[in-house]
């Protein structure tokens, strides 16, 4: 039955992301004139099992994705109640009919799915996070700030993709976040002093990319910055290895720090680092099919949250394997990896039922939309990854979290987090 919540129009628009690459924004409007939008982010380091984007001209346009939104999705969703997220997403999945969303495009589908959710919350007069959370009162997640970039995110010789700080032992998100900013500023000063001011320019995610060659050089810089800022024992360290990117499948070796390491040698490498530094978070330490090696490392690093990103790609099929093998204590949550909000909810619900920590994440190619921050709060994610405290497409998410905490008085998850 047509009512004020019925979808009247779906419209696609080509915009750009934070790397200057084209992406798609989809608007969803109801019969009552309520409208919102969803943007499709894009990653630089991608798991092979992620939903496929529809792009043209070697990735230089998304005109076909826009046409799909305007001429296929628009009529398919016309008249559907915008509050029926499950029905909307099922229609998109059924029309696409591929396992990897390659017909309509994962980018087109996720932008539409996000737009529908945001429009529904707006039509009901609710904040997005409240619409997602329902009656429960969620907490603000702990931020994972990527402050030194390596791997595919940088032009230096570091193989580890992200070096992260986690401000945990604070009473509020604001206290935690601004403490992390102090560390970031200290790091900037150290880099300028040791390598020159030119290396304080920021990368895709707002982190620094000094001319480093080995993992310990980056960890030393961050550890020193934490101590200089006076937050030893309150701010911890983490890494996103993105190990698939430095794995040579022909040799079955990992090429890192000028060495070729087999999986067991790489495991010992991580164990040594965990003894030397306060590392409590380790993402994608092995290539994306190594469920057993993830599990072995997690078993030996019980106080560290080993986390799967490329391992799972926000896909329930692979999470079930990880649960069976006890591969990780944490999972990355990226809605665009799987393609719809409903599938993302299935993934996060299964993880929660198995006491696995949720790490909601941005992508390296982002827009200024702050949806992922509201989403992280709504699902009560334990952590949020959305870059360094720099660049507008990153700070928009942090500013939204500050606003939510201030306006609604939500408690900070780090206050109750035990290592």
Swiss-Prot record:
It comes from the Archaea. One of its GO terms (molecular function) is magnesium ion binding. The keyword Lipid biosynthesis does not apply. Binds a second Mg(2+) ion via substrate during catalysis. Keywords: Cytoplasm, Glycolysis, Lyase, Magnesium, Metal-binding, Secreted. GO terms for cellular component: cell surface; extracellular region; phosphopyruvate hydratase complex. It catalyses: (2R)-2-phosphoglycerate = phosphoenolpyruvate + H2O. Its cofactor is Mg(2+). Its EC number is 4.2.1.11. Catalyzes the reversible conversion of 2-phosphoglycerate (2-PG) into phosphoenolpyruvate (PEP). It is essential for the degradation of carbohydrates via glycolysis. Belongs to the enolase family. This is Enolase. The gene is eno.
